Amino acid sequence: MAEVGVLLLNLGGPDKQEDVRPFLYNLFADPEIIRIPVPPLQKPLAWLISTLRAPKSRKNYQAIGGGSPLRAITNQQGRVLKKALAARGLDIEVYVGMRYWHPFTEEAVRKIKADGIRRLVLLPLYPQYSISTSGSSFKLLDQIWARDPSLKAIERITINSWYSRPGYIRAMGERVREGLDKFDNPDGVHILFSAHGVPRTYVDQDGDPYQRQTEETVDLVMQSLGRPNAHSLAYQSRVGPVEWLKPYTEDTINELAQKGVRSLLAVPVSFISEHIETLQEIEIEYREVAEAAGIHDFRRAKALNVNKTFIDDLAEMVIENLGVYSR
């Protein structure tokens, strides 16, 4: 049995319709997602929000098959990453820990402990760091370690972000190129990078580096792409009445249409796997927005999923952070 492990950290998603409301409750009960000035109100408010949002969310998940594919894709990424590490001569176990649904991070840590892992790489499947994504998972892991003194025997090696890694940037460029080449006139297509938004206060007040890292990602991808296409960056998936990072994706689509754009490639920039935000929000909702605005050639670049360039780069990242040699 390997004594070295990798823990892939991700959001999680409901596997079936019955999971939607409890998944939403777990999401909104996290103070890094919804900040409530009175902490005792966090869970009651999470119950209310999840109950009110569940019917619409179920409908959205129904439109993509009834549930989220994120668990299956992340498990597949774990298997392919393990093979990529083995191909480099390394016996490393790969685990999956989701923040808001099964397999929960707590479940993964129990398995890691039972397997006798001594060195553990924490690899968030979020290229850009945010308080609300990687930060929330790291905080949870700190709490788990604090509750169980025996876990202190496990050395934790944390990867905070990896948005500028050449392999990741190349893989993103491959996906954009694949998407562009499906158009009749690839050079005339406007590329719209759509990233998950965060509340504006996270950046302005708390110093969250997410916006800066996302903007740098887009710049690096466009440099790697080497195409003449015009491009924009916008933010999606906002929740609640507070201001989130702007511009919002739907507003940007309408503005581009007003400027005469008729061919648009939407590129999910902070999502490395297909899930509700790519398959439903971009693929269905934003397509409808685009067509209503007069953009009739709207397409979406695929998420990275198990793209070989991407998985190979994850393997190299693990090796570099462990400080070991591979063949």
Curated annotation (Swiss-Prot):
It is found in: Cytoplasm. GO terms for cellular component: cytoplasm. It catalyses: heme b + 2 H(+) = protoporphyrin IX + Fe(2+). The keyword Ribosomal protein does not apply. GO terms for molecular function: ferrochelatase activity; metal ion binding. It comes from the Bacteria. Transmembrane segments: none annotated. Signal peptide: none annotated. Gene3D superfamilies: 3.40.50.1400. It is an enzyme of class 4 (lyase). NCBIfam families: hemH (TIGR00109). HAMAP family: Ferrochelatase. This is Ferrochelatase. It comes from Gloeobacter violaceus (strain ATCC 29082 / PCC 7421). The gene is hemH.
